[in-house]
Curated annotation (Swiss-Prot):
<feature type="transmembrane region" description="Helical">
    <location>
        <begin position="8"/>
        <end position="28"/>
    </location>
</feature>
<dbReference type="GO" id="GO:0009535">
    <property type="term" value="C:chloroplast thylakoid membrane"/>
</dbReference>
<keyword id="KW-0472">Membrane</keyword>
<dbReference type="GO" id="GO:0009539">
    <property type="term" value="C:photosystem II reaction center"/>
</dbReference>
<keyword id="KW-0674">Reaction center</keyword>
<dbReference type="GO" id="GO:0009523">
    <property type="term" value="C:photosystem II"/>
</dbReference>
<keyword id="KW-0602">Photosynthesis</keyword>
<comment type="function">
    <text>One of the components of the core complex of photosystem II (PSII). PSII is a light-driven water:plastoquinone oxidoreductase that uses light energy to abstract electrons from H(2)O, generating O(2) and a proton gradient subsequently used for ATP formation. It consists of a core antenna complex that captures photons, and an electron transfer chain that converts photonic excitation into a charge separation.</text>
</comment>
<dbReference type="InterPro" id="IPR037267">
    <property type="entry name" value="PSII_PsbJ_sf"/>
</dbReference>
<keyword id="KW-0150">Chloroplast</keyword>
<dbReference type="GO" id="GO:0015979">
    <property type="term" value="P:photosynthesis"/>
</dbReference>
<keyword id="KW-0604">Photosystem II</keyword>
<keyword id="KW-0812">Transmembrane</keyword>
<keyword id="KW-0793">Thylakoid</keyword>
<protein>
    <recommendedName>
        <fullName>Photosystem II reaction center protein J</fullName>
    </recommendedName>
</protein>
<comment type="subunit">
    <text>PSII is composed of 1 copy each of membrane proteins PsbA, PsbB, PsbC, PsbD, PsbE, PsbF, PsbH, PsbI, PsbJ, PsbK, PsbL, PsbM, PsbT, PsbX, PsbY, PsbZ, Psb30/Ycf12, at least 3 peripheral proteins of the oxygen-evolving complex and a large number of cofactors. It forms dimeric complexes.</text>
</comment>
<dbReference type="Pfam" id="PF01788">
    <property type="entry name" value="PsbJ"/>
</dbReference>
Length: 40
């Protein structure tokens, strides 16, 4: 992680790509669970 000159750090790529994916998956699972709970 020391040699990041001229390159994008991997942790930055992982954070930028991971947060929207985890957020969308969380919203999807929360919606499905709340939908199941209201239907039951």
């Amino acid at each position: 992680m020391a040699d990041t000159t001229g390159r994008i750090p991997l942790w930055l790529i992982g954070t930028v790509t991971g947060i929207p994916v985890i957020g969308s998956m969380g919203i999807f699972f929360y919606g499905s669970y709340s939908g199941l709970g209201s239907s039951l």
